[in-house]
């Protein structure tokens, strides 16, 4: 299979994950919404590029007419990607953010993990999330109050406990030395990148 751009790799992974989770591929509109494209036409152009590279087949006449090729489904299992520094404005699972892969079974966690994030700082130490740990994260777009989430506030990515009150979101640390991060949704950008589903002690992987 010909090399993919970071965006193409991200779309291919989204298609695979959608088929695994729901039994069917996403629509163009769903791809556009989940990856922040302005229109379904932008998703269509990326799908055509994936088809040219032999990753998928496009089936005309249906909104879910995407079929994985045998070549794309036989890629070796590299394990869970470890996400390093996240560039401003870029999707968290973009290829350039992946430091390495760990041979971890995603099914160890409930719900299953989609990626690992290295913990920086001690703001969540009171619940056992420590500096240098690997946080297992399940990709979601919406969170419920009380959940531990990976959130992007403007261009900063943080791990905190989620609480929404009206048009404001509070991201709470689990360390009394840190004040909550208050986000006014009327004039600040907030996106949920994932749900924390487990912790791997850093020393376990040395």
From Swiss-Prot:
Reactions this protein catalyses: Hydrolysis of Ala-|-Gly bond in repressor LexA
Molecular-function GO terms, alphabetical: DNA binding; serine-type endopeptidase activity
Active site: 123, 160
Pfam families: LexA_DNA_bind, Peptidase_S24
GO biological process entries: DNA repair; DNA replication; negative regulation of DNA-templated transcription; proteolysis; SOS response
DNA-binding region, residue intervals: 28-48
Cited Gene3D superfamilies: Umud Fragment, subunit A (2.10.109.10), Winged helix-like DNA-binding domain superfamily/Winged helix DNA-binding domain (1.10.10.10)
Keyword line: Autocatalytic cleavage, DNA damage, DNA repair, DNA replication, DNA-binding, Hydrolase, Repressor, SOS response, Transcription, Transcription regulation
E.C. number: 3.4.21.88
UniProt KW Nucleotidyltransferase keyword: no
Domain of life of the source: Bacteria
UniProt site (Cleavage): 88-89
Family annotation (SUPFAM superfamilies): LexA/Signal peptidase, Winged helix' DNA-binding domain
Family (UniProt): Belongs to the peptidase S24 family.
PANTHER family: LEXA REPRESSOR, LEXA REPRESSOR-RELATED
Function description: Represses a number of genes involved in the response to DNA damage (SOS response), including recA and lexA. In the presence of single-stranded DNA, RecA interacts with LexA causing an autocatalytic cleavage which disrupts the DNA-binding part of LexA, leading to derepression of the SOS regulon and eventually DNA repair.
Subunit structure comment from the entry: Homodimer.
Full protein name: LexA repressor
Originating species: Shewanella pealeana (strain ATCC 700345 / ANG-SQ1)
């Amino acid at each position: 299979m010909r090399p993919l751009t970071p965006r193409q790799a991200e779309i291919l992974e989204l298609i695979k994950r959608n088929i695994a989770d729901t039994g069917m591929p996403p629509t163009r509109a769903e791809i556009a919404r989940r990856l922040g494209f302005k229109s379904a036409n932008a998703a269509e152009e990326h799908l055509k590029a994936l088809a040219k590279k032999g990753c998928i087949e496009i089936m005309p006449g249906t909104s879910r007419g995407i079929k994985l090729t045998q070549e794309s489904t036989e890629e070796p299992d590299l394990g869970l990607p470890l996400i390093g520094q996240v560039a401003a404005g870029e999707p968290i699972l973009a290829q350039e953010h992946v430091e390495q892969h760990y041979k971890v079974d995603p099914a160890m966690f409930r719900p299953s993990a989609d990626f690992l994030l290295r913990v920086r700082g001690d703001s969540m130490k009171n619940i056992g999330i420590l500096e240098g740990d690997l946080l297992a994260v399940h990709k979601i777009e919406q969170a419920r109050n009380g959940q531990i989430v990976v959130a992007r506030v403007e261009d900063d990515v943080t791990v905190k406990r989620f609480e929404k009150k009206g048009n404001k979101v509070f991201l709470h640390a689990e360390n009394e030395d840190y004040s909550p991060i208050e986000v006014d949704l009327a004039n600040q950008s907030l996106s949920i990148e994932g749900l924390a589903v487990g912790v791997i002690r850093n020393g376990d992987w040395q």
